[in-house]
């Protein structure tokens, strides 16, 4: 069933599986995963450039749907691990990777020549910051790599998060490398990744997929490809709109987290329990969305995407977004606030931060995940160490090899009672918070998991 939502604004189309009578969706023109499974996916040669948190799950989904997939990455060590059946990310189990390898439809490679002959190339590479500004170096490099092997009739899709206009920049790179013209010789589109590491409910298949193209033909081809992989496809008329949509999603979240972080600090100074106020506000069934205060934001998206958006505003609207920049400043200041608050609390208990034994619970940026990219918990650990504290951390999701310079422990039984302070930074459900509160001399809770008491203080 193809649903068209009409309004005074540019039209957005939502494409879902139709389980009724035959329609255009059933004929394989556009459809969700359900429709495609009835008519069968036309097997294609698919190259997914970048085999990380975004590219690897997508590559395996494409292989499972019947495509022949090259999972390309310039990291040879990562590719060697993939070839041996060792997944580098938690969202892909080793046995799932091994099954894809044994099925013969997924082949990891670091050799550019293996990209020859692709029908569809999906680019899923990092988009970091360089000196506080967007860095498209990985996209440009991937575009040159893909462009060398681009042939007439192929389709290129960008999934990397970036500012509006990036897909057209990629198009310039592809044209320069291939000698072909986008639209006339090859298709080009943008479909923003929406990966949430560790989320078992919203996966590649179940999360609605926004798709766009530089023209109607490209849009239809992008939609057809993803309709064979996911439950619902959302068509957006222009790539720039889809690019802005992704930045809007994460900027909305980052700004609202900054609001509650700021209000939590104001409420603390005024002697008001902010979390109780937040719970009361969340009882309103309309017009309110609850966000939790914490030690900062992490992951590849939230610390970076708002900066891309504010930079884009400066380039095209006459100035940066003061709201977005202030939100980033508030969120970025939280790790230092945690350390300063902890130092003051220890001082009030007759203990200096320098030389204190500090146990950190959680290093990843979110519960249930081992992803420490841009994690505020890691920054807290580094700041504490710089202040002379003796820091150990426990995070069952984070391998010791990932936590460079931080001592990771597995057994909490002796460390909790021995610590001058236990700091809850990532609220993994596997921690026994009641027992920790009972055994610890002092708990500094940044996540609201332990009830405040004479020995428990909340951020």
Where are these regions (language model features)?
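Compositionally biased low-complexity segments, especially N-terminal hydrophobic helices
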Residues: 3, 19-24
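Short, intrinsically disordered low-complexity segments enriched in Ser/Thr with adjacent Pro
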Residues: 9-21
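Low-complexity, intrinsically disordered segments with a bias for serine/threonine
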Residues: 10-11, 25, 40
């Amino acid at each position: 069933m193809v649903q068209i939502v009409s309004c005074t604004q540019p039209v957005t189309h939502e494409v879902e599986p139709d389980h009724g009578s035959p329609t255009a969706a059933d004929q394989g023109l556009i459809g969700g995963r359900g429709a495609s499974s009835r008519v069968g996916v036309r097997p294609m040669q698919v190259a997914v450039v970048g085999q990380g948190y975004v590219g690897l799950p997508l590559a395996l989904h494409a292989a499972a749907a019947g495509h022949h997939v090259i999972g390309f990455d310039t990291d040879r060590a990562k590719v060697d691990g993939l070839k041996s059946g060792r997944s580098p990310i938690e969202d892909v189990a080793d046995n799932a990777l091994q099954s894809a390898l044994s099925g013969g439809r997924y082949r990891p490679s670091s050799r550019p020549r293996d990209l020859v002959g692709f029908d569809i190339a999906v680019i899923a590479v990092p988009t970091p910051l360089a000196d506080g500004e967007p860095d498209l170096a990985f996209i440009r490099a991937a575009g040159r790599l893909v462009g060398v092997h681009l042939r007439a009739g192929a389709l290129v899709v960008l999934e990397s998060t970036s500012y509006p206009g990036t897909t057209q920049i990629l198009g310039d790179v592809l044209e320069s490398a291939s000698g072909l013209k986008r639209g006339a010789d090859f298709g080009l589109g943008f479909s923003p990744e929406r990966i949430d590491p560790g989320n078992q409910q919203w996966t590649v298949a179940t999360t609605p997929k926004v798709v766009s193209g530089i023209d109607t033909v490209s849009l239809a081809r992008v939609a057809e490809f993803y309709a064979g992989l996911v439950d619902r496809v959302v068509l957006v008329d222009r790539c720039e709109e889809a690019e802005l949509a992704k930045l809007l999603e994460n900027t909305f979240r980052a700004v609202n987290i900054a609001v509650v972080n700021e209000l939590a600090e104001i409420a603390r100074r005024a002697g008001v329990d902010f979390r109780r106020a937040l719970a009361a506000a969340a009882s309103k069934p309309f017009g309110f969305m609850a966000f939790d205060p914490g030690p900062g934001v992490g992951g590849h998206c939230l610390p970076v995407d708002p900066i891309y958006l504010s930079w884009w505003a400066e380039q095209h609207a006459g100035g940066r977004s003061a709201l977005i920049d202030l939100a980033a400043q508030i969120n970025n200041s939280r790790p230092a606030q945690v350390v300063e608050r902890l130092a003051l609390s220890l001082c009030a208990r007759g203990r200096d931060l320098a030389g204190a034994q500090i146990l950190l619970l959680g290093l990843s940026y979110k519960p249930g995940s081992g992803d420490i990219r841009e994690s505020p918990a890691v920054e807290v650990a580094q700041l504490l160490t710089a202040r002379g504290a003796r820091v150990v951390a426990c995070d069952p999701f984070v391998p010791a090899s990932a936590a460079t310079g931080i001592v990771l422990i597995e057994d909490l039984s002796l460390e909790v009672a021995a610590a001058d302070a236990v700091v809850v930074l990532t609220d993994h459900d596997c921690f026994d918070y009641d027992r920790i509160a009972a055994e610890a001399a002092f708990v500094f809770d940044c996540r609201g998991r332990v009830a405040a008491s004479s020995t428990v203080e909340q951020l």
